[in-house]
């Protein structure tokens, strides 16, 4: 994938606009120098997230575990229902919620308050994994 004209689509879900903005600012325009630029699609409702995932075209998903309905439940639903589901970064508020993130089958987890470097590095790793394992289009 050429980074000159390619774009990575990142879905960000939270019912809190401030959380969505923090995620967007942490990742920035390009999560790492070796990766394409990021394009964000932001949603505050579960229905909109599932509709977007059904349409496809998302490379990485960032879900707020504290949103209503919870991002961890949405993660589990996406992993169960979406063919070739993109990797998911779950945001949890409490360390003790780690077991829920495991149950949800999230690919990575970060805690709140958000550490911008941790978010960007984790998203970059998920994107690299997605690129490396992407199914070829015939």
What are these regions (language model features)?
Residues 7-28, 61:
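Conserved acidic segment of CheY-like receiver
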Residues 22, 114-123:
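C-terminal output helix
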Residues 31-40:
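A generic structural motif
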Residues 42-60:
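Acidic, metal-coordinating helix/loop segments flanking the phosphotransfer/catalytic sites
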Residues 59-81:
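Conserved phosphotransfer microenvironments
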Residues 89-91:
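Hydrophobic/aromatic residues positioned on beta-strands within the core alpha/beta folds
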Residues 93-110:
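Alpha4 helix (beta4-alpha4-beta5 surface) of REC/receiver domains from two-component response regulators
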Residues 124-138:
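The C-terminal output helix
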């Amino acid at each position: 994938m050429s980074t000159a004209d390619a774009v990575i689509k990142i879905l960000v879900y939270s019912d809190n606009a401030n959380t969505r903005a923090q995620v967007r600012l942490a990742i920035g325009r390009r999560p790492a120098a070796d990766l394409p630029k990021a394009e964000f699609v932001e949603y505050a409702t579960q229905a909109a997230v599932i509709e977007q995932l059904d349409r496809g075209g998302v490379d990485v998903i960032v879900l707020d575990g504290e949103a209503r309905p919870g991002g961890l439940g949405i993660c589990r639903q996406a992993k169960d229902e979406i063919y070739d589901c993109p990797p998911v970064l779950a945001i949890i508020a409490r360390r003790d919620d780690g077991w829920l993130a495991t149950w949800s089958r999230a690919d990575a987890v970060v805690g709140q308050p958000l550490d911008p470097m941790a978010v960007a590095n984790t998203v970059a790793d998920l994107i690299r994994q997605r690129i490396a394992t992407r199914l070829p289009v015939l």
